[in-house]
């Protein structure tokens, strides 16, 4: 590095400590980037790439952004998953000889964003950490730095379990050790799309020991320690707003894996990846940002505690019964700002006067919200009201100190009210009187000189001045006016009196601003003492906001309060898919019943494509989720069990990850459900077996149904195109056939979307193809093939359209000529028997791959 200039050497020394981040290196009014950072940033940020002399023969690549507008560029990099290290000058260049000292003052990463512009109001921004204990369990901790939330748990050392937690939280960043990162599969890293940060230290920092409770396990403490150490090293400031770590058990909530949540579109649409068209979109009428975040948490983790579900239902009932009070509550909530993130910014030291005005205005609403809740004479709502802490002394202090019109800048005055501090009032009087004197001076000088256009002005460079147009300078008396600045068409002067008054005014203004900043920081420090109380208040307000949202949505959409069954039975009368109904309109939607109990555990659903089988299945699951988050449900009547888990395999929107086929994904998801489901679970399987050959698929579908019926006993909705499976109703006591009805009118199919008992009598597949506007000749050809295949129930392989060859044995249908059947060798017979004896449903994916390799070697 000897050939580089001192400044470039300094840059490289700092960059060496932050290899995985873009280093924003402060040079004057710019943040500069060099070398590879410059090459990459210029492309990502679409800024000009230049070069700088640095002691080498060739110029060093360089690009930069103005420091006053750097936030937007930082946000862009963070949104794309990068990290940014902010390197500032920590010495005054005017008083420093030689190289100015520079240090990284903060590392900003996807999981540590604090700037409002980089955060979504109704979404948490989670950073998580992992500690693997002897390969048996994961200590798992996560935090939202912007709100101070900190939680932890212990989960099974399984990638599936880890993925479920990370996706439930929409985690932006995961902290792991180098060894842990190596263990995690590339497939997982690619699938999650989050930022991985390597950090080894995992002991609890001494100043944060109070955040951890004694009963936590070693792996949990290590995960928390790793997270806290990483935040301490990267943020380099007080993190006093971090709350005490709350231990949670995943078993206390309904479990749904990533694919089930995606298939049901709980918080993210499959199509647009946004909220539009999701259950969260429908249920969200929260008035506060923090209420919106809590609502998403509720939907991501439905309750399984009967008492807590009923408590929420009671609150929603009371709010629905008090319409006018609820309207008043909504108006009050609209004026409550994001108390959680305000508290975070206070702790971070980057809160401004307008933030404190928002805090004060929010606190004004708390007594009103409390009074409204108490007026409803509800025991449950009274308990919520009594949790509201109005922080009266803080409200009074903010009212007394901060101006309503305070600017964003905290160093230019205009923040503190008159009368708050006597010394500040003295400085202000001096400044105001001086300005009054100057205004009077302008009038007097005009009279004295007769120059009507003369004016007294001020700028930061030259201070106060008297400006006279060049045409009138001869009217000025000699010896009294001292020239200060020459302009194109005017001259600027100063007089001895103005010079004296300028010093008094500017001294007063400077002292006034210094004192105002000091007083503001004192108020800010006082607010810090209230952080914990504000965080508790924010939680209570958020809960009230979520409950009023449920009440509002339930009323507007004609939802009813469900009953929770004791015997595991499910009875829904005229149930609706809440989101589809909202999109289509209530008049267009066809409601349906659903009944499941110990004698009717499996519903086998048949019917044509596009008839509504998948929608019906989803609506049952969404009804259960609505009930277990404490909301009312879209039905005329509903009795529902408390499901411990929901498993879904719905639709064809498969992620073909890691080169897996649709069928492999299908089987993996089926295995996940069958292995983990209990009698208290809900399983939704849509067209299982469609991804493989006809008879393979049918055989697997039947075996899966039988296995669930005999071993799992979960409530199951199973849709299929294999009409042969409807005969299972005769063999399996707990299986019932239902179908989605359709009729033909004038040769066209009409979907009625109505669920009826019994199997479908026809598939209408060709009619659906016709609706899709396939070529007419193709439709006609398909109709002829269908007619031939249905003839006498014989399976036919078409070798020539005019001379069909009848085949009476069961074979897979083909549209092409087939080779004559060859005699099976003894070696092949052994392989077939070995394959037939394999227990596929009990195999892990790795076992299956090893077995496949073994069989392949026997063939060769």
Swiss-Prot record:
CDD domains: ABC_MutS1 (cd03284)
Binding of ATP, residues: 607-614
GO MF annotation terms: ATP binding; ATP-dependent DNA damage sensor activity; damaged DNA binding; mismatched DNA binding
GO biological process: mismatch repair
Gene (name only): mutS
Function: This protein is involved in the repair of mismatches in DNA. It is possible that it carries out the mismatch recognition step. This protein has a weak ATPase activity.
Keywords assigned by UniProt, alphabetized: ATP-binding, DNA damage, DNA repair, DNA-binding, Nucleotide-binding
Disulfide bonds: none
Gene Ontology, cellular component aspect: cytosol
The keyword DNA repair appears for this protein: yes
Protein name: DNA mismatch repair protein MutS
PROSITE patterns: DNA_MISMATCH_REPAIR_2
Source organism superkingdom: Bacteria
Gene3D superfamilies attached to this UniProt entry: 1.10.1420.10, DNA repair protein MutS, domain I, MutS, connector domain, P-loop containing nucleotide triphosphate hydrolases
Organism of provenance: Listeria welshimeri serovar 6b (strain ATCC 35897 / DSM 20650 / CCUG 15529 / CIP 8149 / NCTC 11857 / SLCC 5334 / V8)
Family designation: Belongs to the DNA mismatch repair MutS family.
Short name of one Pfam family: MutS_V
